[in-house]
Amino acid sequence: MIFTEAKRYYVERRAVDRMLGTRSDSFEHYFGRLRADVQGEIEQFVNAFTVNETYFYREEHQLVCLTSDLLAARLTVKPRGEPIRIWSVPCSTGEEPYSIAIWLLENWPHVDEYDIEIVGSDIDTDAVALARVGVYGKRALMRLPARLVDKYFEADDGASWRILDDLRQSVRFTAVNLVDRANTRLHGKFDVIFCRNVLIYFDDLARRTAAENLFENLSPGGFICLGHTESMSRVSPLFDVARFADAIVYQRPMR
Amino acid sequence: MPLIRKPPSAAAPQTAAPALDARAVLEALARGNDDERWAAARAAADFPAAVPALGDALAHEKSPTVRQALFSALARIATPQSVETILPFLRSDDALIRTEASDALLAMRDVAWPFVPVLLRDPDASVRTQACVLVRDMPSPVAVSLCCDLLDSEPDPNVCAAAVEALAEIGEASALPALMRCADRFRATPFLEFSIRIAIDRVRSQVLNPRA
C-alpha cells in the first residue's frame, strides 16, 4: 500500500488509534510492539488501514456482464462437470460475494445445472469475520430491491438484516494477501475474479506482483473485473482487453 | 438455493506446486517450456544470485508473458546489478521490450534512480528519450533541474519533446526560463514550439493552482 503526503492525516489517525488500542504511551513504544508483532499487532495494524466501504449490487453492470457473457464464454471451454469458480477479492465485509450469489440465483437460468463456488477473500481478517456473520445495515442494502431483501435476508432488528443461512453457506471466506504468491496460489484457479478498487492502493511493484498472482489464479481464458476507474492495461500487459455490451473486463489469454 | 451441490474441497482445483530451489529455477529458466519458465521466473525473485540467469533468459525469451515475469523478478530483487541487467533492453529494437524495461525500472525506482542522469547523457537519442520518461515518473528533488539542463544542451528535438512533456507534468516556476530558451533554439521546429507553449501554460497554471 502506498500513502502520499496528502494521506498523512489518514495514516496518523489510524496509528494513533492503534496506539490507544494497545495502550502504548509513545510512538516508539508502539513501533517496538509492531515490529515484534506482539499479539498479532501487524494484522491489527493492516486491518486499521483497509477501507471497507461497499454495498450490495455495486457496479451492477459487471454482474449483468457476468450472466450475459462471461459465464457463457467460460462454459464453451470448461470441461463438463467442473465447478464454476468465482473469486471476490478483496471482499471486504462480504457484500460483493453475496451480491454475486444473489445475482446468479436471480438472473442466470443455468444456476441449477452447475456447481458454483464463490470465494470471498480479504487481507482484513476483521472484515472477513464480519462477512462470515453476514449481518448488514440499511446503507449496505440501499441498492438491493426490497423484494430481494425480503427473499434473501431475515430482519435481525429494525436496523440490520442477516443473510439466510443457505446463502451464507454458499460463499466461502478466506484471508488473503494479494501480493503474497504462496498465499494466493492456495486459492486455486478461478473462472472469474472480481478485483475492484484495490490495485489503486498499491505501488508499482506491488501492483505488478498482484497482477501476476491474479494471472496465476485465473484459468486460461478466465476473466478479471476491475473497478470502473481502474485499467489493467496500465498495470500489466499479461491480460487481453475483453469488451462486452455491459462492461470492459480483462481476460487471461487461452495460451 | 445452495450454489454448491458437493463439498468445496472436492470442487476446488489445487494449483499449489512445490517451491523451486535455486538450481531448479536456473534449470527451468534455461530449458523449461512456457509454463515452467514462467514459474521459474516468478520463483527467481527470491534468489538474488539468479540475476545473470534472468538477464540471459531475457535476451532469448520469445514469450511476452514469461518476459514480463522475468522483468518483474529483476524488479523485485531490486539491486544495482538487476538495474544494470535491465538497461540494455532500453536499446531494444522492439518498442514493447523498451517499454517493459522502462516499467521494470519504475517498479524499483529507488535503486534505478542513480542510473537515470547517466541515461540522460547516453549517445543514443532513443535512450535519452526513455530517460526523460523515467524522470517524469520518478519524483525526485532534482528531476526538474535535470530536465532543464537537458533542454539547454540537447540537439535532438524529439528528446527535447520528451523532456518538455516531463516538465509539463512535474514542472515548477524554475523550469519556465529553460522552456523558453528551448523554444527559441527550435524556432524552426513547429511541433516542439507548440509542445513548449502547452507545457508553459500548464506549469503556470500549476504554479497558480498547486495540487493538494
Predicted region positions:
Chain A
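Residue-level signal for inorganic ion chemistry
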Residues: 66, 193, 218
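A structural alpha-helix within SAM-dependent methyltransferase catalytic domains
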Residues: 67, 101-105, 215
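Extended basic-aromatic, gly/pro-enriched interface segments that bind polyanionic ligands
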Residues: 89, 109-194, 198-209, 232-233
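Conserved SAM-binding loop of SAM-dependent methyltransferases across substrates and taxa
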Residues: 93-111
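Core SAM-dependent methyltransferase catalytic element
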Residues: 192, 233-255
